[in-house]
C-alpha cells in the first residue's frame, strides 16, 4: 500500500507505517496543484495530511482510497467530494487533547493576569504595575470549563 504524507509528520509515525509494510512517500511541501500531481504520479492509495487542504482536484487526480487527517476535524478535506468518489476520510481525534488542555489553562492564566493588555501597554512604553497587579489568581477557586 502506498502512503503519501503531504505535511510534516513524526518520524516515528513514518517508521511505524514502514514496519507494517507500507511504501511511504513523504513530501511536507505539497500544496494545491503539486499535491494533485504527486497523488497522480505516486499512485498513492492513502493520503495523510495535517493542515494541507485537500480539494476536489486533488481527490480526482489519482486512485486514493483513504484520506487521513493527522489531527482532529475534517476542515481541510473536501469530504463531500471524497464521498462522491468512494474515498474514505478519517481523522485522529483526541491526539492533541493534552496540548489543547495545556493551552486552555495558559489562556485562563493570561486572562486572569491580563497579560495581553499588559504587553500592549509595555510596547507603548507604559508600566502600569498597579493596574496589572490585580490578578485574582486561581488558588482556592472553583473553575468551570464549558466545551462545545
Segments from the language model and where they lie:
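Phosphate-binding beta-alpha-beta segment of Rossmann-like dinucleotide-binding domains, i.e.
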Residues: 85, 93-142
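An N-terminal-biased, well-structured beta-alpha scaffold segment characteristic
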Residues: 1-90
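Hydrophobic Val/Ile/Leu positions in short beta-strands of Rossmann-like dinucleotide-binding domains
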Residues: 5, 143-145
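Glycine-rich Rossmann-fold phosphate-binding loop(s) that bind the pyrophosphate
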Residues: 148
Amino acid at each position: 500500500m502506498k502512503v503519501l504524507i503531504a505535511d510534516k509528520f513524526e518520524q516515528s509515525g513514518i517508521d511505524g507505517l514502514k514496519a507494517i509494510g507500507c511504501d511511504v512517500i513523504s513530501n511536507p511541501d505539497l500544496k494545491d496543484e503539486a499535491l494533485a500531481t504527486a497523488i497522480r504520479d505516486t499512485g498513492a492509495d492513502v493520503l495523510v495530511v495535517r493542515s494541507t487542504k485537500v480539494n476536489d482536484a486533488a481527490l480526482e487526480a489519482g486512485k486514493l482510497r483513504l484520506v487521513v487527517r493527522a489531527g482532529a476535524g475534517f476542515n481541510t478535506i473536501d469530504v463531500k467530494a471524497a464521498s462522491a468518489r468512494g474515498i474514505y476520510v478519517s481523522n485522529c481525534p483526541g491526539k492533541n487533547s493534552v496540548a489543547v488542555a495545556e493551552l486552555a489553562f495558559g489562556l485562563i492564566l493570561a486572562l486572569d493576569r491580563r497579560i495581553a493588555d499588559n504587553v500592549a501597554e509595555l510596547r507603548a512604553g507604559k508600566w502600569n504595575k498597579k493596574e496589572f497587579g490585580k490578578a485574582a489568581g486561581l488558588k482556592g477557586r472553583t473553575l468551570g470549563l464549558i466545551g462545545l
